[in-house]
């Protein structure tokens, strides 16, 4: 016969197994923002290693910029940014083919539209991200406006890792 303390502990343990709390058992969905820059590709590589170790889904996200001013002047903006996204997908596929026998990482590629910060927020929300990985900004202008990474950290909604 079990003591009442053991029975209570057993009931608590049973309740904990049935309840899932997002982000408590290690990340299951890791979002990595990529834009083709060296730092974003390092962030993707770091995120892939983390996803492999945690057996998590790696969601590689490219935020396609909306450049209405360029489009208004007749520049083929959508075509150019679409080519960037396609180039990134091809580069990622080539890298994963080379490494598929060494590492087995489940990954998906997603394209969102908008500015990088809002695009990554939308992606992280829609994909139910447990963690967000981004590369450090390589732009001097971000010292004044604020980098995407800093804005994601300030949002306080996910653990954010910034890869140099």
Predicted stretch roles:
Residues 62, 135-137, 164:
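Short secondary-structure boundary segments
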Residues 1-25, 97-132, 139:
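Structural beta-alpha unit
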Residues 61, 108-112, 161:
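General small-molecule cofactor/ligand-binding pocket signal
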Residues 131-155:
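Glycine-rich, Arg-bearing micro-motifs that act as flexible, cationic patches
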